Amino acid sequence: MRGIRDPRLIPIAEKVMEGKRLSFEDGLVLYQTKDLPTLMRLANLVRERKHGHKTYFVHSIRVSQTNICYVGCTFCAFQRRFGEEGAWDWDVDEVVAWVKERYQPGLTEIHLTAGHHPKRPFAYYLDLVRALKENFPGVQVKAWTAAEIHHFSKIARLPYREVLKALKEAGLDAMPGGGAEIFAERVRRKIARAKVSAEGWLEIHRTAHELGIPTNATMLYGHIETLEERLDHMDRLRRLQDETGGFMSFIPLAFQPDGNQLARELGKKEFTTGLDDLRNLAVARLYLDNFPHIKGYWATLTPELAQVSLDWGVTDVDGTLIEERIVHMAGSPTPQGLTKRELARIILMAGRIPVERDALYREVRVWDRVEA
């Protein structure tokens, strides 16, 4: 590869072009280099080797049945206590009614994540999955992070495997990747002390994969973590993916510095920079060689930067969302949803091929043009 300005990238580029795995030290170089054009070219080489110009999105709706939560993560602006202003807590019928009001033809995914409610029994969550599958046949339910599965395990006094088996029998199709934050214990003690441990998160996803439940993985960055801790997070995911092959995508999530305790403690008002976001996506694409997709989540990146990210290793921009709440309550300035046409246009204008998918990355439609 010609035009490499940082000599440290030469052996890394050779590995990438030969399809060889990068080391932890290689990953640190990618985070440190100022040769961003080469970093971009390498990440794009891998994305096109895996998927060509195809870029995926899903027709989805986001549902948060409650924001009542006892966990107290310091980065969260979503959580509320009982009786607190802005708190909500829906029963099964209210969730179904809410989705029906916003249902659009062609919807393929209902994405459920919410607070850790201290009083709802596990049966409520099973009933909710069943009700959604019954009322919206053919729509896939992607529901509850490993942190929520850990919570269900505690309230039901059941091992992870039994919780996941019951959810799958109720109709669960896939799991999102939230709750991972940063695996480093130093960071988790500060930002998510009461949440599932890193080891617990990984064990839940390992168990889900063994049961045939595909999952995703996230990383929250741009707060107090170091570059080494970001890479350690990816390294643990890569090792689990070697073992199970059950992850579909990796989604880096930029910290949103509004209305939360962590931002106030840090005196932080600025969002991550575009270059940090793009570098992070590129490093992920190069380091996580066994992950099918790296997702540029437009709700935190902005639609414009998500479009640029398609040259930095990204092959998925998430979906229509339809009233996403969690990152927007933390200050994300992006829209709460985009139409399929808007997403397809973003992808087409970047010179890529828009592919509408379902929750399991099965192709639904290839968009060859977008009508004005």
UniProtKB/Swiss-Prot annotation:
[4Fe-4S] cluster binds at C69, C73, C76. It catalyses: 3-[(1-carboxyvinyl)-oxy]benzoate + S-adenosyl-L-methionine + H2O = 6-amino-6-deoxyfutalosine + hydrogencarbonate + L-methionine + H(+). It comes from the Bacteria. Binds 1 [4Fe-4S] cluster. The cluster is likely coordinated with 3 cysteines and an exchangeable S-adenosyl-L-methionine. Radical SAM enzyme that catalyzes the addition of the adenosyl radical to the double bond of 3-[(1-carboxyvinyl)oxy]benzoate, leading to aminodeoxyfutalosine (AFL), a key intermediate in the formation of menaquinone (MK, vitamin K2) from chorismate. Belongs to the radical SAM superfamily. MqnE family. This is Aminodeoxyfutalosine synthase. It comes from Thermus thermophilus (strain ATCC 27634 / DSM 579 / HB8). The lineage of its organism: Bacteria, Thermotogati, Deinococcota, Deinococci, Thermales.
